[in-house]
Amino acid sequence: MPYDYDLRCPCGTGLTYGQCCHRYHAGNHHAPTAEALMRSRFTAFAAGETDYLLDTWDPATRPAELTLDDRLEFYRLEILETEGGGPFDATGRVKFQAFHRGLADGVQEEDSTFRKMDGRWVYSLGDVAE
């Protein structure tokens, strides 16, 4: 389901989707930081952009396919902590909470690692809090 270009982006920046994560999902730009990639991936979960999720996943850990359950709605992202992940770093870490409702209401807390591959950030691994 495509996300509305004029709605506020679910990643939490306060910008519209068209001003924010759409440029990454459309392939016009690459996220400049690990946090920006995390935000764009959260929005991809919210928008059902599975191709983008797979494309920004480290090939060493990426699943062969990805199916999202459209009964689960991701609606809010809170960044708790970042380490590294800047434009000149090779690795980064982003700890966040992803709020969801629908099939199951709740919050998922994850500590994710990222690395630069061929000059662009990719998601490597995530440690989900119990």
UniProtKB/Swiss-Prot annotation:
One Pfam family from the UniProt entry? YchJ_M-like
Q: Which domain of life is it from?
A: Bacteria
Q: Which family does it belong to?
A: Belongs to the UPF0225 family.
What is this protein called in UniProt? UPF0225 protein CE1570
Organism, scientific name: Corynebacterium efficiens (strain DSM 44549 / YS-314 / AJ 12310 / JCM 11189 / NBRC 100395)
